[in-house]
C-alpha cells in the first residue's frame, strides 16, 4: 500500500461523461431535444454495453494529490478543469449529484471490504473472506499488453448474496499480482437508481515495488425519476508521476 509511505505525491486526470442511455428516435423527438436538433448527429454506440448513447456533458480535471502519513494530511491541488456540454437539458439538481457521490468512490480491491452504493462488498482478493464468499474459475492464459496473465472469473458462491462478479487477470509469474480487474455488481431493488455498474482497473508495479492503480474506468447505468429516465455515467481516471520524496 503506497499510503504506508511517509509522503506521497502523484498526478491525477479525471474525465466524467454523462450520456443519455438507450437512445431511440422517440426520445430525440422530445420537446427538450427539439430545441437542439444537432444532437442527433452525436449519437454513438457504447463499446461496453452495445447500446446507443448520446453524450450530454463532459467534465475534465487535472490535479496533484499530496499525502502525508504523520500527521495525517491529504491535499488536492487542482491544476486545470474544463466542462463542456448542454447542462441546461439535465438540470436534475441535488438528486443526480447525490447519486454520483454514492457511485463514484474510489475502488481498492486490495482492501478486504470495498464500499459502494452505501453497501460493503467483499473484495475478490480479500485475505479474510474471499475464498469462502466467491467461487473462482481459471478461464484462459492471455497477454495483457506485454504481460502474460491468467484470467480468473469469479462469482458469489451463493447466487443470493450481494457481491461482485467479474474477472481478475493475474500475473503468470512468481508475484501472482493483479495486472487488471473487471468487476461488476448486480441490480438490486433497494438500490433502484443503479441498473448496472462496471469497474475496470489496470495495475502496475512501481520501481520501488508498490502495486498501484494507473488507470480506472467506472461505468454506471442509472434510472432517474425525471423526463430523462435512463442515463449512463462514465468516469475515467489516470494516475501517474508517483513520487515518495
Can you annotate each of these PLM segments?
Residues 62, 179, 197, 204-207, ...:
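Extended, regular secondary-structure scaffolds
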Residues 1-151, 155-163, 225-245:
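Structured extracytoplasmic
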Residues 134-140, 165-167, 184-186, 198-200:
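Short structured motifs
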Residues 145-153, 177-182, 210-215:
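Short, hydrophobic/aromatic-rich segments at coil-to-beta transitions
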Residues 184-186, 191-233:
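Short aromatic loop motif centered on NTY/YTY
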Residues 141, 157, 173-174, 186:
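Solvent-exposed coil/turn segments that connect beta secondary-structure elements
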Residues 163, 172-184:
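Surface-exposed extracellular loop regions of Gram-negative outer-membrane beta-barrel proteins
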Residues 3, 166-173, 198-208:
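Extended lipid/amphipathic-ligand handling interfaces
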Amino acid at each position: 500500500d503506497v499510503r504506508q509511505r511517509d509522503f506521497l505525491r502523484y498526478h491525477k486526470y479525471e474525465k466524467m461523461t454523462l450520456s443519455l442511455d438507450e437512445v431511440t428516435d422517440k426520445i430525440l423527438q422530445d420537446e427538450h431535444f427539439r430545441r437542439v436538433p444537432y444532437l442527433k448527429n452525436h449519437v454513438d454506440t457504447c463499446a461496453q454495453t452495445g447500446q446507443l448513447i448520446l453524450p450530454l456533458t463532459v467534465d475534465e480535471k487535472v490535479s496533484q494529490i499530496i499525502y502525508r502519513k504523520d500527521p495525517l494530511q491529504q491535499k488536492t491541488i487542482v491544476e486545470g478543469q474544463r466542462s463542456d456540454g448542454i447542462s441546461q437539458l439535465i438540470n436534475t439538481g441535488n438528486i443526480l449529484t447525490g447519486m454520483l457521490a454514492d457511485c463514484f468512490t474510489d475502488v481498492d480491491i486490495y482492501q478486504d471490504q470495498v464500499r459502494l452504493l452505501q453497501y460493503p462488498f467483499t473484495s475478490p482478493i480479500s485475505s479474510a473472506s474471499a475464498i469462502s464468499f466467491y467461487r473462482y474459475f481459471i478461464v484462459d492464459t492471455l497477454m495483457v499488453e506485454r504481460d502474460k496473465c491468467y484470467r480468473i472469473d469469479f462469482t458469489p458462491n451463493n447466487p443470493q448474496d450481494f457481491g461482485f462478479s467479474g474477472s481478475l487477470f493475474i500475473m503468470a509469474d512468481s508475484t501472482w499480482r493483479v495486472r487488471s480487474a473487471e468487476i461488476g455488481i448486480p441490480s438490486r431493488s433497494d438500490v433502484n437508481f443503479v441498473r448496472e455498474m462496471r469497474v475496470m482497473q489496470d495495475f502496475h508495479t512501481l520501481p520501488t515495488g508498490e502495486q498501484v492503480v494507473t488507470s480506472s474506468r467506472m461505468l454506471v447505468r442509472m434510472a432517474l425519476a425525471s423526463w430523462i429516465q435512463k442515463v449512463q455515467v462514465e468516469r475515467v481516471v489516470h494516475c501517474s508521476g508517483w513520487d515518495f520524496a
